[in-house]
């Protein structure tokens, strides 16, 4: 079962990191954000991850798609809050 707290926590964390990521011009900062998000999703509720990932195992873990993924994750979480 996905709890309201887990949704709100994920939303807050991902929303904050996305805002920094999309405005950052520093590659090292973007890489650090990707690592932090990767670590976060490894530990988050599997059920919640599946709900926002559309079944993609590499969601929020693929460097080439990360910018799009983080935006989609925040949008999907906004819809279920």
Place the predicted regions along the sequence by residue.
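Amphipathic alpha-helical interaction surfaces
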Residues: 16, 20, 39, 43-47, ...
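Generic structural concept
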Residues: 8-11, 34-38, 67, 71-74, ...
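Acidic, low-complexity, intrinsically disordered interaction modules
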Residues: 26-67
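Amphipathic alpha-helical binding modules
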Residues: 17, 55-81
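N-terminal acidic leader/helix
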Residues: 2-32
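Intrinsic low-complexity, intrinsically disordered segments enriched in polar/basic residues
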Residues: 1-3, 31, 68, 80-81
């Amino acid at each position: 079962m996905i709890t309201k707290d887990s949704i709100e926590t994920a939303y807050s964390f991902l929303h904050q990191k996305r805002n920094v990521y999309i405005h950052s011009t520093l590659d090292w900062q973007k890489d650090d954000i990707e690592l932090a998000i990767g670590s976060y999703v490894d530990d988050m509720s599997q059920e919640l991850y599946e709900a926002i990932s559309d079944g993609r195992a590499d969601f929020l873990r693929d460097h080439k798609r990360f910018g799009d993924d983080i935006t989609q994750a925040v949008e999907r979480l906004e819809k279920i809050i």
